[in-house]
Amino acid sequence: MSTTAPRAVAERWRELHGEDHWKGLLDPLDADLRRSVIGYGELAQATNDAFIREAWSPHAGACRYSRDRFLEKAQASTQLAGLYEVTAFFYATAGAGGVPAPFMVRNRESNWMGYVAVATDAGVAALGRRDVVVAWRGTVRPMEWLNDLDFTLVSAAGVLGAGGRSPAPRVHRGWLSIYTASDPASKYSKLSAREQISDEIKRLMDKYKDEETSITVVGHSLGAAVATLNAADIVSNGLNQHGACPVTAVAFACPRVGDSGFRKLFDELPGLRLLRVCNSPDVVPKYPPMGYADVGVELPVDTRRSPYLKSPGNQAVWHSLECYMHGVAGAQGKRGGFKLEVDRDVALVNKNVDALKEEYHVPPSWSVQRDKGMVRGADGHWKLMDYEGEESSQDK
């Protein structure tokens, strides 16, 4: 990843991808795994940074950047952009039932939900395989959804092919709706997010069928919940069919997705792994509180131990993905304390929140588009230019 020694990852990628459920790697946190998790976090963070959330924009709900410029423009590192290329965007309909309002910008019939990327040839050399990444976007306003969350569980048999299982797996209605809803009248959501992603994964698996491959699904907050469902679907329905292609989800601040039946199914699916990064004071991974079960392996962090952050902090800080990555960078496990083990800029934690101590002189919520997307033309008049269009320049 952007902060990983390439040779180490290339040689150990199956171990780092969870082949042995990360045994012996979490406490103390393995250096290569630490960097790898942060790298996948950066791929998830890019979805938040690129999303047009301003309701007054005619492009609200879209991605600011085209596919070919995405990783470069969404503030991902140069190294990271060189390791992956985005091959597809995917969308979900804004009318999905049971979806918390903060997940969507409601003035569009569909919302951009994330992207599919694949390792470049340089990425293959650095990562040891052709990694396919599915990155899900999180919420628009991260915390407001908690007050209105619908905890209804519904059958997942239609997605996971789990008919006849006992207990039958059930999942959160809202997460399932985001994943499976479609709108024939929509330009972008004629197919569900599930179908859009499945089609692209099938295409990439066929294109690289003679290579060693992996699939990694990443997300933060509600995006992590849908990523969990997505990863289970990929394995349950054999989309990783070419050879032994492992599927791993890296989920930051993930709310619970399903019941004990879903956990049983998840645990039984071959080649499926999930690393659940949880910040101890963050309440989101503890929701919904009843009737649901955790899946995967937990990587605990505690940003309250960081000497860089204001104390005691607040829920917005504890839930922030940038703060999560800061926590991963400095986590010391059971021995306690906090020490940055990788060179990750502490200014990043203030990108969207007010977390850093005043002595670092970094303004809170500093990540704003220059002039709010307004550009002055040759005629001296200002015009909103906050959207490049999805189509890559090479396709135009």
Swiss-Prot record:
Gene Ontology BP, a term: lipid catabolic process
Entry keywords, A to Z: Cytoplasm, Hydrolase, Lipid degradation, Lipid metabolism
Disulfide bonds: none
Principal location: cytoplasm
Database matches in InterPro entries: AB_hydrolase_fold (IPR029058), Fungal_lipase-type (IPR002921), PLA (IPR033556)
Active site (record annotation): S221 (acyl-ester intermediate), S221 (charge relay system), D282 (charge relay system), H319 (charge relay system)
Any one GO cellular component localisation term in the record: cytoplasm
E.C. numbers: 3.1.1.-
GO terms, molecular function: phospholipase A1 activity
Enzyme's top EC category: hydrolase
Keyword Hydrolase: yes
PANTHER family: PHOSPHOLIPASE A1-IIGAMMA
Function: Acylhydrolase that catalyzes the hydrolysis of phospholipids at the sn-1 position.
Name this polypeptide is given: Phospholipase A1-II 4
